[in-house]
Amino acid sequence: MQTRRETLKQSAVVAGLLASAGFPQFAHAAFNKAAFDAKGVQDAVKAAGGGAIAESKDVTITGPDIAENGAVVPLGASTSLPGVKQMLILVEKNPAALVAMFHVSDAVEANFSTRAKMGQSSDVYAVAIMADGKALYAKKEVKVTLGGCGG
């Protein structure tokens, strides 16, 4: 007869196998390789599904004026506009401009933050891609004193 301990151990093994079989497919499903491989801001926005970018006072980008360590630069993007499909954070002079892509639903407020690696001083963009494909942006210059990309 099987003991309770053996039953729990076998159940944990089965649950682990089932979980590991399904999750990797979902983790890779939302990755947009073309957008993250794009070299320029406009190319990344286009690959993410947006059109030509236009500046907007309704989109905000937050970050330091001077980043002492380019390896961990705190950046934020937000907007109160309705109908936002995606929010992007881009660093113009990084080898790959797109730093972060956030998918937005109607149930979520479009207010995101992350930390980025910056190799040099650059303009940083927050781009809101709307449901109709319009891409609205805000821009901020961040000066880096110590490079994060091998500097």
What residue spans do the PLM features occupy?
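Short beta-strand edge segments in extracellular beta-sheet folds
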Residues: E141-G147
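An anionic, turn-rich surface loop/hairpin at beta-sheet edges
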Residues: K93-M118
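Transition segment at domain starts
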Residues: A30-E68, A100-F102
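Extracellular Ig-like/FN3 beta-sandwich strand-entry sites
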Residues: G119-D123
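Sec/Tat signal peptide C-region and signal peptidase I cleavage site
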Residues: F23-A29
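Short edge beta-strand/loop segments characteristic of extracellular beta-sandwich folds
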Residues: T62, P74-S80
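N-terminal secretory signal peptides and thylakoid transit peptides that target proteins
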Residues: M1-L18
